[in-house]
Amino acid sequence: MEKRERHFVLVHGACHGAWCWYKVTTFLRSAGHKVTALDLAAAGANGKRLDELNSISDYHEPLMKFMTSLVAGEKVILVAHSLGGVSVSVAMERFPQKISVAVFVSAYMPGPDFNLSTVYQELHQRRQGASKDTQYTFDRGSNNPPTSIIFSPEDLAAKLYQLSPPEDLTLATTLMRPTKLFRGENLLKETTVTREKYGTVRRVYIVCDKDNILKEDFQRWMIKNNPSDEVKVIMGSDHMPMFSKPLDLCAYLQEIVESYS
């Protein structure tokens, strides 16, 4: 029986862009699927500047515009990596009828009873995330919280890409852009999700067991507090499975789409 084409929508994490999915995009297209890898605002090749982003809604606007553009009856598979999980969660809340399944790949996964502030606080308490080598910008002065972040070459090599091919690390150091940091009540309001909408979309979480920035115990803590329909594990993957274990990631994505589409 001929396989039906599915449409994967790939959403990158902080400081990255659509470029980070080049291996996954190539593999899925060669398998007969349609793939859209998006650049969020002021990321990748997107033309926006950081100072044009006033809220996290501005940041994930390209994904929301894309979801709005889908024709009636069309459903996509949303794949989120890292910080992309926040944008995908909001898309699930706004467009549940347009999503067949959402896949969180070592990604932030807030939920109806588990907001983004709780996720960030737990990450901070575990002393995970970016290190002292990370480069921050303080556009509102050094007495105020930082306004943007970009991973240092040291963080990339030790925490994100430690098991990835060196040429992909070089690619990242060439193409990365800073990510705006959003805070306050508006952040929580704009990322709130509900059981009635977000909760109706099926979710799969893919754990990366050798992730040095969102460690496995933190990933499983999110899953425990906001259970997904299924959990898969990529063994021997750093934070960037699209580089360190691209075939394993693509195999899982194809399994998921067969089960949930």
From Swiss-Prot:
Protein known as? Methyl jasmonate esterase 1
Please name the Gene3D superfamilies in this protein's record: alpha/beta hydrolase
Provide the assembly information: Homodimer.
Which is one GO molecular function term here? methyl salicylate esterase activity
**Which reaction is catalysed here?**
methyl (-)-jasmonate + H2O = jasmonate + methanol + H(+); methyl salicylate + H2O = salicylate + methanol + H(+)
Question: What induces or represses expression of this protein, per its UniProt record?
Answer: By cold and UV-B.
According to its UniProt entry, the function of this protein is described as: Methylesterase that catalyzes the hydrolysis of methyl jasmonate (MeJA) into jasmonate (JA). Can also use methyl salicylate (MeSA) as substrate with a lower efficiency.
GO biological process terms, semicolon-separated? jasmonic acid metabolic process; oxylipin biosynthetic process; response to cold; response to UV-B; salicylic acid metabolic process
Give all residue intervals belonging to the AB hydrolase-1 domain: 8-251
Read off the PANTHER family from this record: METHYL JASMONATE ESTERASE 1, METHYLESTERASE FAMILY MEMBER
What are the entry keywords?
Hydrolase
Q: Which residues form the active site?
A: 82, 211, 239
Q: Which family does it belong to?
A: Belongs to the AB hydrolase superfamily. Methylesterase family.
The Enzyme Commission number assigned here is: 3.1.1.-
Question: Pathway, according to UniProt?
Answer: Plant hormone biosynthesis; Lipid metabolism; oxylipin biosynthesis
